Amino acid sequence: MWGQPPSAVRSSAARPLLRPPPPPPLLPLLFYNAQVKIWDVIIVGGGIIGLSLSIALRKRGAAVLIVERGEPGREASHAAGGMLVDCLIETPLALQPLATASARLYPEFAHELEIESGMKVDLRDQGTILFLSPEHAARNSQLLVCNSLPIPLAQLEPALADHQLPVLYLKERSVDPRALTAAAWKTAKNRGVDFSSGDEVTTITITAGCATGVTTTKTAFRAPKVVNCAGAWSGQIGPTNVPTRPVKGQMLCLLMPSRTLLQHVVRAPEVYLIPRSDGRLLVGATVEEAGFDKRTDLATIQRLHRAALALVPKLADAKIHDDWAGLRPGTPDALPILGATETPGYYVATGHFRDGILLAPITAEVMTAVIEGRTPEFDLTAFSPARFE
């Protein structure tokens, strides 16, 4: 359905000029290109959601431009843990079909990115050990029966301390979000997606009631379709109310004394642990209403560190490698915002909160259908931007 890639606009004068035309004004190259180039779709935001969508659209032949306020993949995607959690205990009921479908897509999604980028994304399928609080256990007794440990906990993960909490074993995967996003960025570039980085969108351009592009702090870009994938910043642009807010999460990274010390993702009421294949161990994470503040604080990092040591005492020998904070895009009802808006040509794919990494493949799939005017495989009514009008 998409046309040819953007090309320069050529003059079609009716008669030859009597004298040479005056030279064009000395405009920045980026501005000049924006005047003579029209994309099929402009995506605002270069996190994993925007990158995945751009790849899906390019597969369908669309000419795509990603406009990113910083560097692609350096905000929430960079700070994420990468647990591919589709367990009903923690997933809102309305989101469960999308979460389950996206988790199933992940092996193919990750493999494709690895093949096309030549990079590894560290997709692991060792599973998750989940310690439940008494309250969660009482509400999910059936899950305790269906997801019991395959072998005693002391054999499954010997480094774990003894615990009295109910425990589940979940066949979940994990992925390295930084590696995943880097691979998606390279894949998008290899497929011909255009990028404008360090370029903050200030407004969506509206002409005759329809979206026709974006205006940035540097210039303007044109396209008949614009998708807001700006994460925690989504509410700051566009003609439609997009009530996202930043939800801060602090994490730290330990270097395990042995790469085999911990093999499974471990989730407990106070902390979660995510081992990487290279011996790193991510420890997270807080959920804080702190505006756009991305600073870490020592007391919080120390609290997370103590919680990790309580789960795995041998981590006392682990070195602290790094700590950071990221801003997840939260929404009033804890559900993503996916779909077309009341402004023709303007779409939204944001508000994934803690599930952006998990939901990237399915978001790309359903939003590509919506943008092309096809009916998506899943009912998106619960995620419609119109629910906030």
For the regions a language model picked out, list residue spans one by one.
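Short hydrophobic core segments
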Residues: I42-V44, F221-G231, A364
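C-terminal catalytic lobe of FAD-dependent flavoproteins
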Residues: A318-E389
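Helical element adjacent to the flavin cofactor pocket in flavoenzyme catalytic cores
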Residues: Y169-T217
